[in-house]
Amino acid sequence: MTSGKPVILVVEDEAVVRLMAIIVAEESGFEALSAATADEAIKILESRSDIRLVFTDVNMPGSMNGLRLAHAVRGRWPPVELLVTSAVGNITAKDLPQRGRFLPKPYDVAKLSEAFQEMAGG
């Protein structure tokens, strides 16, 4: 059952950080789904057609990191917006898929909410 709100999928392996992003999404008026790995995120994307934005960390365990996930999402679900985050490494525009955006960690809650609104708002 969907809420009728725009849907954001938060992909983050650190539970506390994932929960914080979910809270920001929900307080910003979105329905939030979560995944701890890219593989879990792909399964959710395959089962839901209403996801507007994937917000993913780069460094995660599993078969692919967040950048590979972002490129996979762009290839399979072109309308889905992509917001990538990381505390390490120099992520540049050339690393991101088309229309992807980068938000460095640690991020300000207001900036995260603003990015969610700009990228997935109704």
Name every feature range the model reports, one short phrase each:
Residues M1-L9, A15, I22, E40, ...:
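Non-catalytic signal-transmission and effector/linker regions of two-component phosphorelay proteins
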Residues I91-Q98:
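Short loop/helix-cap segments at secondary-structure boundaries that form the rim of catalytic
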Residues S34-L53, A93:
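Acidic, metal-coordinating helix/loop segments flanking the phosphotransfer/catalytic sites
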Residues T85-S86:
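Hydrophobic/aromatic residues positioned on beta-strands within the core alpha/beta folds
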Residues T37, M64-L69:
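Acidic catalytic/metal-coordinating carboxylates
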Residues A15-L33:
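Two-component/phosphorelay signaling modules centered on CheY-like receiver
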Residues D57-V58:
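Active-site residues of response regulator receiver
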